[in-house]
Design a protein with these regions (language model features):
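Multi-pass alpha-helical transmembrane bundle typical of ion/small-solute transporters
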Residues: 1-252
Length: 252
């Protein structure tokens, strides 16, 4: 146990778990707020606490299963691809916020149920990321979750504001997911033998390339989305303008 805590790699992995948890739990915090917004004031705190407790329980179970599955051949390769996709998706602005369709309940247990179900569905990306950062170490997984969960509950709104103010945080977060994806790829049982025969720098280069790929691809797709939106707006303006001219001519 003492050796584990004195290992620098342990603390690097803990920081990765905390960062991934905080990064991918911003929407979950909004869901909690939306689900409890119609509760009586005196029940809101209970709704948040009970909902978060249930969501945490489900998330821990999901993560344990994910860590167990990651010991099987090809699973880490699939997980790495999923993490790359999650990281890229994180950098692309969404049309609507995930939480806008969350139904607010006026009853305590209805709100709790909404929080648990929504968190379960929205935490799949979180689970894959945390399981990858834990590298099959259950002790590390528990330690990381115990630290990050209270931080999520109390500081996720603050982090959301920071992300709005400093978008570079989102890019760094996406790159982190790409880095973890690269690490997962290098430790899959199928490529482990090949990876161990490579120079030490390769073990850092592959994760670094994963992070770089996510950052570049995500920003490129986001830029394309902005250009496409501007083009659609211009077309709409031209169509509406020509319609107005036709209406005026017919009126004359």
């Amino acid at each position: 146990m003492i050796e584990m805590f004195s290992n620098p790699q342990f603390w690097i992995s803990v920081l990765q778990i905390i960062a991934i948890d905080l990064l991918l739990s911003g929407d979950n915090a909004v869901v909690i707020a939306l689900a409890c917004r119609n509760l009586p004031v005196e029940q809101r705190k209970k709704g948040v606490l009970f909902g978060v407790a249930g969501a945490i329980f489900l998330r821990v179970i999901l993560t344990f299963f994910a860590v167990s599955l990651l010991t099987l051949p090809y699973i880490k390769l699939v997980g790495a691809v999923l993490l790359l996709w999650i990281g890229i998706k994180l950098l692309i602005p969404e049309e609507e916020h995930h939480g806008t369709n969350i139904k607010a309940d006026t009853h305590l247990w209805g709100a709790v149920k909404t929080i648990i179900i929504a968190d379960f569905v929205m935490s799949l990306d979180n689970v894959i990321g945390v399981a990858g950062a834990a590298k099959g170490n259950f002790g590390l997984l528990i330690f990381g979750l115990l630290i990050s969960i209270p931080m999520i509950v109390w500081s996720s709104q603050f982090i959301l504001k920071l992300m709005d103010r400093y978008p570079v945080i989102i890019i760094m977060g996406g790159a982190l997911l790409g880095f973890v994806a690269g690490e997962m790829l290098m430790t899959d049982t199928v490529v482990k033998g090949w990876a161990e025969a490579q120079p030490h720098w390769v073990h850092w280069a592959v994760p670094a390339l994963g992070g770089l790929m996510v950052a570049i691809t995500g920003k490129w797709l986001a830029a394309r989305q902005v250009v496409a939106k501007k083009a659609i707006t211009l077309v709409d303006q031209k169509v509406s303008g020509s319609s107005e001219k036709k209406t005026k001519r017919s009126a004359k």
